[in-house]
């Protein structure tokens, strides 16, 4: 049984040694993530080339994800670089950019004074130190320190429950996205998205520069949660970024939010990624905790298309072992899924198109005939995406002549992309797709398969289903 849940591996110093990326692909990596909060364009380009070369050697499609730094709110400079903040003392966030000390420091978001009020909580350095706002004095924010802790230059500031007037993308984000377009990357994981207009702004930037990257907003603050339905409607997928989300909303709310986001993404057939601290202990240990195994397993049971490794592969001591463990967990969970129940549950929902209805029928047919695979030759990826929505037990083999389409649908649950030549007719399409599935080992002689494809020749735009045995 082939793994259906996609694994995203963050690239970094731990993946740089020769052979590591090859081992990640062999162990189950489907997508490579590049975190543009760190590193230079030159460093990322070297890693992009390394992934592409390894994918070529493996004969597999590997998608590339550009994760933006985002419009973060951060502290300014401390004169000494770092200070010790003491519980109960006053600490002022200043409009002025002069170097700070243990009594004050600047903040880069200059409108913050107009967006907070007395009683609001601000969190520094991912929640390490809490501040409560006492008063707004001109454009300065006077606070009381809630707990002692060290603090240093440029640490992040979070404002839980407050919608901030931050831009959708920073100047750095714009430069990074243009770099991604120029280097044919596939997805933008857009940090700190608060509203649908943020997504539209990024889409406009991509179109302006002739790009085709799909946009995956990261839901990591209360505004993103509150505006989720509208954000989902204009997005190509969603990432549940649990690390920052757990700072911005109460930690006990994160599992509830995660499940609801997955449910809504599944309902409309858009891919959803669950990220952050999934196998965190494997950064330094060769084996995960039992809680981490359960966390990964539950994300898969809930319906995640993809699960992501961050520091585990970027800077950890056991990057390959982490991917192997994630693959093992995914396979075990997928063996336990009640595919017939999933098909029945999703058949209740209103289907919006002929392709939607035919895709559901295809999955039902594949289940009832015990087909080994569903073959989806595709020009645009549309049929493949809709088939994936219904979570078939059979492997989805997508034969695509367009490299960009092959990489985009590769993020989808259960889809194995094959990049092939453009076909010349219906029979050539069927033959090419079947040969490709055989040569890649996704099917074998004697396997029963279901083929579904949108026809664009003389069939008037129809969708056809064919059941056949591989010979």
Language-model segments: what does each one mean?
Residues 1-471:
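Non-catalytic helical/linker scaffolds that mediate oligomerization, partner binding
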């Amino acid at each position: 049984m082939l793994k259906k849940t996609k694994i995203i591996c963050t690239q970094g110093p731990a993946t740089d040694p020769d052979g590591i990326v090859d081992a990640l692909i062999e162990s189950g990596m489907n997508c490579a993530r590049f975190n543009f909060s760190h590193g230079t364009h030159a460093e990322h380009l070297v890693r992009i080339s390394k992934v592409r070369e390894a994918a070529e050697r493996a004969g597999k499609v590997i998608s590339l994800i550009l994760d933006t730094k985002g419009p973060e709110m951060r502290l300014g400079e401390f004169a000494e670089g770092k200070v010790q903040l003491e519980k109960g003392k006053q600490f002022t966030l200043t409009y002025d950019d002069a170097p700070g000390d243990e009594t004050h420091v600047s903040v880069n978001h200059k409108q913050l004074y107009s967006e907070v009020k007395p009683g609001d909580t601000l969190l520094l350095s991912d929640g390490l130190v809490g501040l409560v706002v006492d008063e707004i004095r001109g454009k300065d924010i006077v606070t009381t320190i809630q707990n002692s802790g060290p603090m240093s230059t440029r640490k992040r500031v979070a404002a839980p429950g407050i919608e901030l007037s931050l831009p959708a993308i920073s100047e750095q984000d714009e430069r990074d996205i243009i770099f991604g377009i120029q280097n044919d990357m596939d997805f933008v994981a857009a940090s700190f998205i608060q509203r649908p207009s943020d997504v539209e702004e990024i889409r406009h930037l991509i179109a302006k520069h002739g790009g085709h990257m799909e946009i995956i907003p990261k839901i990591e603050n209360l505004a993103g949660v509150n505006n989720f339905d509208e954000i989902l409607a204009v997005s190509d997928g969603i990432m549940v970024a649990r690390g920052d989300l757990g700072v911005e909303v109460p930690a006990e709310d994160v599992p509830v939010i995660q499940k609801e986001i997955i449910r809504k993404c599944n309902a409309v057939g858009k891919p959803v990624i669950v990220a952050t601290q999934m196998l965190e202990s494997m950064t330094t240990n060769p084996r995960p905790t039992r809680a981490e195994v359960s966390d990964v397993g539950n994300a898969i049971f809930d319906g995640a298309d993809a699960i992501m490794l961050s520091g585990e592969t970027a800077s950890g001591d056991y990057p390959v072992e982490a991917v192997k463990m994630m693959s093992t967990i995914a396979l075990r969970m997928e063996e336990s899924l009640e595919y017939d129940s999933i098909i029945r549950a999703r058949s209740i929902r209103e289907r919006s198109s002929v392709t939607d209805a035919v895709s559901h029928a295809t999955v039902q047919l594949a289940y009832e005939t015990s087909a080994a695979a569903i073959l989806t030759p595709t020009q645009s990826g549309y049929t493949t995406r809709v088939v994936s929505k219904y979570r078939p037990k059979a492997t989805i083999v997508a034969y695509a002549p367009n490299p960009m389409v092959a990489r985009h649908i590769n993020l989808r649950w259960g889809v194995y992309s094959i990049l092939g030549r453009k076909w010349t007719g219906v029979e050539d399409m069927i033959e090419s797709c079947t040969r490709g599935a055989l040569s890649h080992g996704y099917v074998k002689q004697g396997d029963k398969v279901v083929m579904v494809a949108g026809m664009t020749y003389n069939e008037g735009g129809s969708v056809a289903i064919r059941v056949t045995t591989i010979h």
